[in-house]
């Protein structure tokens, strides 16, 4: 299908092709040791996880995306890590920095200060969740994703953090969620909105919606596009929708069209 002109407030449809996703085995890890050995167990090896999905709660897919893309991806990794790993006796999760680096597609970079900076920004930001009210099992609220962050000098190759208690139950055992392939974080590094759009559309598909109907304003808000930018659909289609859907169609196992 082909898009035509539209203004903010009008609803557009985005549809999915057949056989979009296969669901790989979901790995579950437990640990009971202490010290660095325990943190190693709490941070599963990346080679075991490359094909995995994160069960990202719908309410945590639709949020105010004001932070940079790196921080958004790290948030998804935090959610996944907390689903497959245990916290320590003090309630902290320990995620390996190299795990984050690899999934961000930074294989040739050892910019670990930037990774910790991403955690700091996430820690410093209060976020509005369930932005569009799609998750009826989850109350809409504003809170941080992580509420405590250990200093990097105390954690070595790991980053230690605590989840917000209002979000942790939904993260550990989500009732309504999107299945998002972790490897797509690196594959959909560009264009800017490819991975956020992939998350949003994956959520629609996971909930059985083969056609996602969103107004232009809703889609802009979901992607974190603020202000009057792209208020006309023609500009939005040219600069945002067309290049980002092309990246999704070319690099993932899904085919998406818009109307």
Identify what each model region corresponds to:
Residues 5, 9-259:
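Charged, alpha-helix-forming regions
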């Amino acid at each position: 299908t082909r898009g035509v002109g539209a203004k903010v407030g009008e609803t557009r449809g985005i549809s999915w092709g057949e056989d979009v996703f296969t669901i790989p085995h979901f790995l579950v890890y437990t640990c009971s040791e202490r010290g660095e050995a325990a943190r190693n167990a709490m941070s599963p090896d990346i080679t075991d996880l490359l094909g995995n999905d994160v069960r990202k709660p719908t309410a945590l897919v639709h949020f105010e995306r004001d932070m940079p893309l790196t921080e958004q991806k790290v948030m998804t990794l935090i959610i996944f890590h907390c689903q497959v790993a245990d916290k320590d006796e003090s309630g902290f999760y320990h995620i390996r920095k190299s795990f984050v680096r690899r999934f961000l597609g930074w294989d040739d970079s050892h910019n670990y200060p930037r990774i910790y900076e991403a955690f700091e920004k996430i820690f410093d930001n209060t976020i509005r969740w369930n932005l569009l009210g799609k998750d009826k099992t989850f109350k809409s609220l504003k809170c941080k994703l992580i509420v405590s962050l250990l200093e990097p000098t105390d954690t070595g190759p790991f980053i230690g953090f605590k989840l917000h208690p209002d979000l942790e139950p939904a993260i550990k055992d989500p009732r309504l969620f999107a299945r998002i392939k972790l490897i797509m974080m690196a594959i959909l590094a560009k264009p800017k909105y490819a991975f956020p759009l992939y998350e949003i559309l994956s959520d629609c598909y996971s909930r059985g919606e083969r056609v996602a109907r969103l107004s232009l304003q809703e889609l802009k808000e979901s992607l974190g596009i603020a202000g009057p930018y792209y208020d006309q659909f023609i500009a939005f289609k040219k600069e945002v929708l067309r290049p980002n859907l092309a990246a999704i169609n070319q690099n993932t196992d899904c085919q998406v069209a818009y109307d």
